[in-house]
Amino acid sequence: MGRAYQNRKESMAKTAAAKTKVYSKYGREIYMAAKAGGIDPQANLSLRGLIERAKKDQVPTHVIEKAIDKAKGGAGEDYAPARYEGYGPGNCMVIVDCLTDNPNRTFGDVRLAFTKTKCKIGTPGAVAHMFDHCAIFAFAGQDEEAVLEALMEADVDVTDIESEDGKITVFTPNTEYAKAKQALEAAFEGIEFDVDEIQFLPKTTTVVEGDDIPMFEKFLDMLNDLDDVQNVFHNAELPQE
């Protein structure tokens, strides 16, 4: 799992959008999390995790506060999640997660990115079964046995635990996110998460090579340029530079 996760992080770094896109992405997610679960980060773990990630990505405080204030006031856009699946260059598998206030527009924009790069958008569920929908927590530590024990005592369904270079990474089903985070924070006072996310991790990878590489990069760029796109997950494995 760790390798797939690292591949994704490296891919994200290469295709990171401009700052304004990052701010907009977090603004929407924070607004939706606050609207759904309340504006208090201590009571709303999803909101707290988003705020912590936004700060690590250098999102200004005023952007975060504006999104929460908008949720508090009950005003603002009515975003809904949308997910699209399909096959990218080299026949790699792709999941595109969006937040949209206009599903028809979003579908049209995402479909255009697929068709412009000779890719195929599929039906719901077309490739999702080939990914694990995981909650991921990474933090400094070496005693993975103590971590596993704390999670087991809290009745958390643990998928995997990895320990490497003084860092422990915990993988659980996405539905266990809140329970796992609460268990870790209760067991290890002052714990600071380097990673605190829900991701789709591929069960297998597809090698993308030759002429498919620039097409794949163009495909990701087109998707990441769309305001409604929040995350792009894929199983592509690119040659090491």
From Swiss-Prot:
InterPro entries according to UniProt: Integrase-like_N, TACO1_YebC-like_2nd/3rd_dom, TACO1_YebC_N, Transcrip_reg_TACO1-like, Transcrip_reg_TACO1-like_dom3, YebC-like
Protein source organism: Marinobacter nauticus (strain ATCC 700491 / DSM 11845 / VT8) (Marinobacter aquaeolei)
Disulfide bonds: none
GO MF annotations in UniProt: DNA binding
Protein name per Swiss-Prot or TrEMBL: Probable transcriptional regulatory protein Maqu_2154
Gene Ontology, cellular component aspect: cytosol
Compartments where found: Cytoplasm
Highest rank taxon of the organism: Bacteria
UniProt entry keywords in alphabetical sequence: Cytoplasm, DNA-binding, Transcription, Transcription regulation
Chief localisation class: cytoplasm
Record family assignment: Belongs to the TACO1 family.
GO biological process, one term: regulation of DNA-templated transcription
